[in-house]
Amino acid sequence: MSVRYTLNLRVFWPLVTGLCTALVCLYHALRSSEDARAESPDGADSGFPLLKVAILLLLGYILLRCRHAIRQRLLPGSSRPRGHANFSARSLQEPGLSILLESYYEHEVRLSPHVLGHSKAHVSRIVGELVQAGRARGSPGLITGGALALAFRGDFIQVGSAYEQHKIRRPDSFDVLVPLRLPPQVALEPRSLGTEPSLTPAFRSCFVCALKAPPSPSGASTGQWHRDCKPFAEGFCVDVQGRRHLSATLVLRWFQAHLQRSLATVRYSLEGRCRVSLTPGSLEQPPTLHILPCRTDYGCCRLSMAVRLIPAVHLGDGVFLVAPPPPPSPSGALSELPGGLRAEALWGVNTARQEQKLLGWLQERAPPGACYLKCLQLLKALRDLGARGLDPMAATHWGRILSSYVLKTAVLEVLLNEGSPTPSWDEAHLSECLEKLVKFLRDCLLRRRDLFHCVLGPTGAAAEVGPLPKVLREAAPVDLLAPFDPHSRELAAARLLSTWRRLPQLLRVYGGPRYLARCPAPRSQRIQGSPEDEP
């Protein structure tokens, strides 16, 4: 993405004047030195033209500065305030919140579709070769040594904001699901933990997956199945309540090792196009593939990119099991798991396919010029502005409460409550739509309403996203903000409202052209657009 620069006229014109003066002086110095050899010493007034040129340049610069000062005085509201009447006239000339939002969106938030398209295509080619190499290295079933193992399914699924048209700032990070294939002798029996009464809210969105024998037409005995699957159970499962459960930790460990071997296979073939490296991950941060452009690659829009490769186990109907969500606090109360549950056996659920269908369904019914995706992008930018000035730990906690997924769910919830985007979501009402979302988030943070998962909610969106696996249809509703304690939610709501009230001032300081930041925002505009009632 191109870097944008703004021209400072206060520096530009003196610099041009000085440069022109230096060039004229150099020209006359060289000319006078040549003429001095041929002329007699009585030509002592040869420096007079140089003095005239310098005086003319100086007068021209003074005239330009005087013209600029006169224009500033003649413009309404540009002079210094001389009483209440002049201050009111000046406040009318200040750019409103809508203009500031549009300027900030164009200069700081909006992505170039051209650059984003090239970046996504480049990522698809690199990840596609890596996944195909991983698939060729092993297949499900019996492998050397007689053990059963996982394998790459051979495809990948692009998820996240870059593929849902609401990514902001730079197209340098992407999320990709890498589906894994189970051996044919292994089947899963997933179970939701949402109905566990003794479980803390942070883990009620998790699932556990016990192993079970797949339906067999030959009627093989259960004992024989246990003996056949023993290598797989010992390598990828942990014991929970007397049954073997698939472990996200052990699957991630195998996934990282298999990625390293696959990357070694394709690294040589990629040398002419890019340099690739793999950073190991954890349950909170999956392995990251770093793609750096080569000097010999002259392709368009080559950037340094980071691709998070997320191992995923397919449940059915486009729903995948992934690593569980991180705990609400860095300390993470994993010791509070009751009933013999183990943290290694917990899984999260990824419904990116259903959410993409839901966004497509809304786009089909939205009027031309609907700005709900732009509002989502500006909501993310508002969150980032609110994190300024916080220490790293507080900024991380703020980002977890108002994560991108929470903000996207809030936008979807508001739209689904209205049925579909109405004409009120036109770009002409951008600031009003953003204010509506801020109020909705404030109510959710203050527990005046719940913010349910858009697929795992009480009503859900099953009619719009298509069929769901039975385990999801029967799962308890998931409130995305329930894992956070009331005090943290109240602080987040207060900071969100404070950021919204100061938004015009923040936009003048941190974004947009310089002409929007010449004067401080008047008090009437700083208050404009903020929610009336506070927590």
Swiss-Prot record:
List of residues that carry Phosphoserine: 139
Membrane topology: Single-pass type I membrane protein
Keyword Phosphoprotein: yes
Primary location: membrane
GO cellular component, one term: membrane
Residues that span the membrane, as ranges: 44-64
Domain of life according to the entry: Eukaryota
Extracellular-facing ranges: 33-43
Compartment(s): Membrane
Signal peptide (from-to): 1-32
Pfam families hit by this protein: Mab-21_C (PF20266)
Keywords assigned by UniProt, alphabetized: Membrane, Phosphoprotein, Signal, Transmembrane, Transmembrane helix
SMART domains found in the cross-reference section: Mab-21
Ranges of the Cytoplasmic topological domain: 65-535
PANTHER family xref list: CELL FATE DETERMINING PROTEIN MAB21-RELATED, INOSITOL 1,4,5-TRISPHOSPHATE RECEPTOR-INTERACTING PROTEIN-LIKE 2
Family: Belongs to the ITPRIP family.
Protein name, as recorded: Inositol 1,4,5-trisphosphate receptor-interacting protein-like 2
Organism of provenance: Mus musculus
